[in-house]
Amino acid sequence: MLKKIITALGMSGMLLASSNAIAEDTKTKNDNLSPQSVDLSPLRNLNKLDSPMDKDYNYHQAFKKLDTEQLKKDMQDLLTQSQDWWPADFGNYGPFFIRLSWHDAGTYRIYDGRGGANRGQQRFSPLNSWPDNVNLDKARQLLWPIKQKYGDAVSWSDLIVLAGTVSLESMGMKPIGFAFGREDDWQGDDTNWGLSPEEIMSSNVRDGKLAPAYAATQMGLIYVNPEGPDGKPDIKGAASEIRQAFRAMGMTDKETVALIAGGHTFGKTHGAVPEDKVKQAIGPAPDKAPIEQQGLGWHNSYGTGNGDDTMGSGLEGSWTSTPTFWNHDFLHNLYNLDWKKTLSPAGAHQWTPTNAKPENMVPDAHKLGVKHKPIMFTTDLALKEDDGFNKYTQEFYNNPEEFKEEFAKAWFKLTHRDMGPKSRYIGPWIPEQNFIWQDPVPAADYKQVSTQDIAQLEQDIINSGLTNQQLIKTAWDSASTYRKTDYRGGSNGARIALAPEKDWQMNEPAKLEVVLTKLKEIQTNFNNSKTDGTKVSLADLIVLGGNVGVEQAAKQAGYNIQMPFVPGRTDATQAQTDIESFNYLKTKSDGFINYTDGSISADKLPQTLVEKASMLDLNIPEMTVLVGGMRALDVNYDNSQEGVLTTTPGQLNNSFFVNLLDMSTQWKKSDKKDGEYIGIDRKTGKQKWTASPVDLIFGSNSELKAVAQVYAENGNEQKFVNDFAKAWHKVMMLGRFDVQQ
C-alpha cells in the first residue's frame, strides 16, 4: 500500500550506511569512480562557506542571551494555538512536534555516527522531502515565529528537539532533562542516504529490502513499514524488522518498547484520502513542489486538505482515547482488546478491536461528539507477540511508573545520542545523571602537570626504551578512533587500554601491551613521586609519548620542533565503557597506517581513507601531510613497508612525496598480491618500492597530486614538518571539548 501513497510515519531512525559500508556498497554515489577519481567532497567544509553568520559568530556565546524559561513558555503557548492553515489535531500540536523531534533525531545510526538531530539536517533535501517526513514541513513552519523571535540565540536543531520535549512535558510526561548545544548546518550533507524515491518505487529493487548496513528495513521508510514487511501484515516479521532497525540506532529491546509504546500514547496517524484518489490528490514533496508553495510540499486537494482530510502515512486513527495525555492506555489496549485486521480509508493495513467498549473509543481529532475505534499497527502488535518485546510490554503494563521512567530515559537518549559527551551540553536543564551511552570519562580530582612536570615525563619516556614508532602508532591508534559525526572516540579516556579497543586487530594487541605496560609504569612512578596532588593520566601519557616520538623523529631529520601539549585527559574505567557500542568505532581500514582487515576491495581503499580523514575532521592538505609523514615515520600496521618511500625510515621528512613524484620510478601492479604496486627503476628494472592504492592516489588524483607537489618542492621541507606537527596536534586534540568551548 505504501508504495502507492506517501510512506508511513515511522517513529525513528532511518540510519545511513556506515562509512566502510558506503565504500563497499554497490549503490553508492562513488560506484562508477576509478581510484584516481576518488571523491574528496567529504573533506570540504562547505557549510562554513555557505553560512550567513558573521565569522566571529559563536553559538555558545549567543546562547548566553537566551531566556530559556520564556522560550519554553512560548513553546507551551504555541501548542494550543491552532492555525487555520494547518489545524491542530485534538487542538494540540504536541503529538505533531513529538513526531517532528523523533524523526529528526531518529536518523542517527550507530555504525558511523551519521544522522541525528545535531545540525538540523531535516530542514534540507533530501530529508525534508523524505516520504516518512510527510507534513513535517508544516511543523517546522509552525515553529518559525518562535525561531524568528529568538534569532541567533537558539539554533534550529535545538529548537526542533526542544519542541518535542516541551510537548511531552505539557502532556504529562516529564522528561529527565534537555541539553542545548546543537549547531546548525546551512546545506544538506552529501551522505549516502540510500536510493532515491524514484529508485525506491522501481520494480527492479530487490523487494524493497535494504542491505544490513542500513538501519531502516525498507527503502523510503524511516525505520520499518508499520503495515508489516513489504506492506504485508506479518506480525512476527515486523518484530524482526523493528529489532534490526532500533539496534542500528543503538537501542536495546527495552528502550525500543518504551519508545514505541510511549510515542504511540499520543496523537494520530493520517490516511483520510480514499485509496483511489490519493495519486490525484497529493502533490509533490517540498523539493519538487511548485515555487509558489514556498517550500511546503504534499499539497492535498482532497476536501479541505487538512484537518479530518489530512493525508500522511495512509494509516488512519489513534491508539488511545486520550491522545494528548500521557498514560499507559496503549499497553492496556494492546493486551485487553481483540484486534482484527482491517484497512484504512486509504487502503493501508491496520488493526481495530472487535470488543471495544465506550471508554476505549477515541474522540475525533476535529469534530466534537464524534468517536472512532482505536487502532494498532502491525508493528504495534509485534510488541505483544514477539517474546523479547513481550517481556517488556508486560513489565511496563504492570508497572506504569517504570514505563514512564524508561520512556523518559529512552527519549533523552534518542534526542541526545548524537551530541557526544556530556561536556558538549549547555543550558539549565542538563540532568545530573550520567549514562554509559555518553561515553563518560571521570572528572580530574587531581592537580594537572606543570611545564616542568611535562619536561620530566618526556625524558622518562625517552629513557623508557620505547621506540619512536611504538610511541607514535599507539598515540595514533588512541586518538584516531574519533568520529566528528557523533563526537565519539578520541584520546580522552585512554580506552585503547580497555576492552574492546585493546583487542582490535589494527591495534596489534601484543605490541600495544608492551607500550601500555611501560607507560603505566612511568605513570605510577611519577604519581607516587608527587606530594602536591599532581598526577598524570595514562591518556595524557599516550599523547605525550606520541609527541615525543614525533619530536625525536624530526630531530633525526635535522628539524627542531616542540609539539604543543595540553594536559587534562582522564582515564575511563571498563565499567564506563560499553563494549558493544565501542566496537562500532572499529574501522575496517585506516589508510594513514596502511591497515585493512581484508574486507574492502583494494580499489575502494583510497575512498575509505577519505572517509577516515573526514571522520577526523581533516581537510585535504591535512590528510595529505599526515599520510606522507606517517609513511616517512615508518609506522604502518604490522611493520608493512608499503608506501615507506624513503631511505631514512623513521625520520620525519618529505621523502614520501619526493619519491612518489620521481619519474625515475615506474609503477606496476603486483602479480603476487592484490592491491600492491611495485615501484621499478626505469633504467635498471630493479624493484625500489612497494605501495598501496592509498599511497599512489597522491600521485594519481589531480587535486591530491597538486598538494603532494607542494610538499615535495625544494624549500618546503620545513613547511612539511611544521604542517605535519599542526595536523598531528589537531588529531590528538579531537574530543577535547573541555578545552574547546
Swiss-Prot record:
It holds the Pfam family peroxidase. The active site is at H103. This is Catalase-peroxidase. The gene is katG. Heme b binds at H264. The record marks R99 as: Transition state stabilizer. HAMAP family: Catal_peroxid. GO terms for biological process: cellular response to hydrogen peroxide; hydrogen peroxide catabolic process. Formation of the three residue Trp-Tyr-Met cross-link is important for the catalase, but not the peroxidase activity of the enzyme. Belongs to the peroxidase family. Peroxidase/catalase subfamily.
